[in-house]
UniProtKB/Swiss-Prot annotation:
Start-end of Basic and acidic residues biased regions: 329-349, 375-384, 469-483
Name of this chain's protein: Prolactin receptor
Functional note: This is a receptor for the anterior pituitary hormone prolactin.
Naturally occurring in which organism (per UniProt): Bos taurus
Free-text domain note: The WSXWS motif appears to be necessary for proper protein folding and thereby efficient intracellular transport and cell-surface receptor binding.
Length: 581
């Protein structure tokens, strides 16, 4: 019996449910919370939107609980905020707590709940619009007229205590315009508007926003009529500035046109060109560098090279002990075609290039149309072929015994530079000359001494002939002289007579030469310097002119008359030095 009663109850319920569904009744839809706003962080109000009620009367309730609590509370006031709202008074508002709010819809068919909304009172502040909006036209005597807008802060917002920082936005426009002109202010409750159009009616609205929260609603529109005689802009100053600028521009254009200058030249002057004396820009543009350098050299600039550079350009002349003591290659080796071994010469001294057999043979093969002449210091002449003489600085020396006049071979074979071995008694004292001036003075002294010794005794003539001759037969010597490798002096060459009391060879060693001066043409003037000075100081001659090159690798220099004249003018007169032997 009991089982039958239970089945009957279930059947009846299903019947009623089906009937209600056929009539359109159902549980309510889920409501939606719209927003919660607080006008001043002391109270707040929440609003929701109800869903479909399901054809039945539906009751809505708002429940909440604070973060960290389990106790659920219902809305304290459903009437203050209006329909579908809940108002939280100061008693139920806490600024330091997070609220979890839910809306429930209930009818006979069931219950529906909205999604929870998390609310913090500090971030939901939306103040009321500013109150007491006032518009007024001001006409001050010392300034332009303007529109003065004034308002009051929202009534429910405590601004005086500093609890809020309110920002205001004002917008205005002519009545018939569509775009608003906006202005922003901070903490101020008044604003001045200039540059209004006369005869227009302006509409003004204002709203506010706290530092953390939302903009309030716009206040109701306020309007004001601008009179027709309202000045718009004071353009007199701008007109004066424009006229003054135009006058200045006209004066500048007139000045430029009068002087014939272009505007670009006046504004951007050209870069000044080089102002070097004698510098021609056209030569540089045409690529004529030689003429340009010649023009620069013509100025009073100091010489670009010093004495060291000039000395490096000349060939070093010295007398090597090894060369003098080297034995002459035997006749047997010469006949067998074996060449004598040469010493390893210093490539930097200049002797290596002049001792080269190939270079000497090439120089000796060239015929000399006019052999070099050896003159006295009183009448030196210019070398006719200086390049050949300078190249063969190491050529041997020969002396004519028959005529008792010394002559010098400018070009000779390399094998003639090795003298015969002589006994120690026949060796003359060695000289410690190390430069051109010592060699020249020694050569001049030897020339005079040879002539004197030949006149006195035949024995000295025999020794001189043995020293100078190359060891070959007289026919070979004459043949070499006929081919142009020897240079003889002219018959009219006047030789100075040696002094009667001049010694044969001075045993006093000569030290390194002294550089007297370097002329502007690059001529190097030298004179010897001795270790010991006997007697009064002696004046030395300047040997700066090359006369010829002897066969014994001696460069013969003679005094330059022009250089001596200049020396006499520049320096005080000194006692003439004795003639070197």
């Amino acid at each position: 019996m009991k089982e039958n009663a239970a089945s009957r109850v279930v059947f009846i319920l299903l019947l009623f449910l089906s009937v209600s569904l056929l009539n359109g009744q159902s549980p309510p839809e889920k409501p939606k919370l719209v927003k919660c706003r607080s006008p001043g962080k002391e109270t707040f109000t929440c609003w929701w939107e109800p869903g479909a009620d399901g054809g039945l009367p539906t009751n809505y309730t708002l429940t909440y609980h604070k973060e960290g609590e389990t106790l659920i509370h219902e809305c304290p006031d459903y009437k203050t905020g209006g329909p579908n709202s809940c108002y939280f008074s100061k008693k139920h508002t806490s600024i330091w707590k997070m609220y979890v709010i839910t809306v429930n819809a209930i009818n006979q068919m069931g219950i529906s709940s909205s999604d929870p909304l998390y609310v913090h009172v500090t971030y939901i502040v939306e103040p009321e619009p500013p109150a007491n909006l006032t518009l007024e036209l001001k006409h001050p005597e010392d300034r332009k007229p303007y529109l003065w807008i004034k308002w009051s802060p929202p009534t429910m917002t405590d601004v005086k205590s500093g609890w809020f920082i309110i920002q205001y936005e004002i917008r205005l426009k002519p009545e018939k315009a569509t775009d608003w002109e906006t202005h922003f202010t901070l903490k101020q409750t008044q604003l001045k508007i200039f540059n209004l159009y006369p005869g227009q009616k302006y509409l003004v609205q204002i709203r506010c926003k706290p530092d953390h929260g939302y903009w309030s609603e716009w206040s109701p529109e306020s309007s004001i009529q601008i009179p027709n005689d309202f000045p718009v802009k004071d353009t007199s100053m701008w007109i004066f500035v424009a006229i003054l600028s135009a006058v200045i521009c006209l004066i500048m254009v007139w000045a430029v046109a009068l002087k014939g200058y272009s505007m670009v030249t006046c504004i951007l002057p050209p870069v000044p060109g080089p102002k070097i004396k004698g510098f021609d820009v056209h030569l540089l543009e045409k690529g004529k560098s030689e003429e340009l350098l010649r023009a620069l050299e013509s100025q009073d600039f100091p010489p670009t090279s010093d004495c060291e550079d000039l000395l490096m350009e000349f060939i070093e002349v010295d007398d090597c002990e090894d060369q003098q003591l080297m034995p002459r290659p035997s006749k047997e080796h010469t006949e067998q075609g074996v060449k004598p071994m040469h010493l390893d010469l210093d490539s930097d001294s200049g002797r290596g290039s002049c001792d080269s057999p190939s270079l000497l043979s090439e120089k000796c093969d060239e015929p000399q149309a006019h052999p070099s002449k050896f003159h006295t210091p009183e009448g030196p002449e210019k070398l006719e072929n200086p390049e050949t003489n300078l190249t063969c600085l190491q050529a041997p020396q020969s002396t004519s015994v028959e005529g008792k006049i010394p002559y010098f071979l400018a070009n000779g074979p390399k094998s003639s530079t090795w003298p015969f071995p002589q006994p120690p008694s026949l060796y003359s004292p060695r000289y410690s000359y190390h430069n051109i001036a010592d060699v020249c003075e020694l050569a001049l002294g030897m020339a005079g001494t040879t002539a004197t010794s030949l006149d006195q005794t035949d024995q000295h003539a025999l020794k001189a002939s043995k020293t100078i001759e190359t060891g070959r037969e007289g026919k070979a010597t004459k043949q070499r002289e006929s081919e142009g490798c020897s240079s003889k002096p002219d018959q009219d060459t006047v030789w100075p007579r040696p002094q009667d009391k001049t010694p044969l060879i001075s045993a006093k060693p000569l030290e390194y030469v002294e550089i007297h001066k370097v002329s502007q043409d690059g001529v190097l003037a030298l004179f010897p310097k001795q270790n010991e000075k006997f007697g009064a100081p002696e004046a030395s001659k300047e040997y700066s002119k090359v006369s010829r090159v002897t066969d014994s690798n001696i460069l013969v220099l003679v005094p330059d008359p022009q250089a001596q004249n200049l020396t006499l003018l520049e320096e005080p007169a000194k006692k003439a030095p004795p003639a070197l032997p």
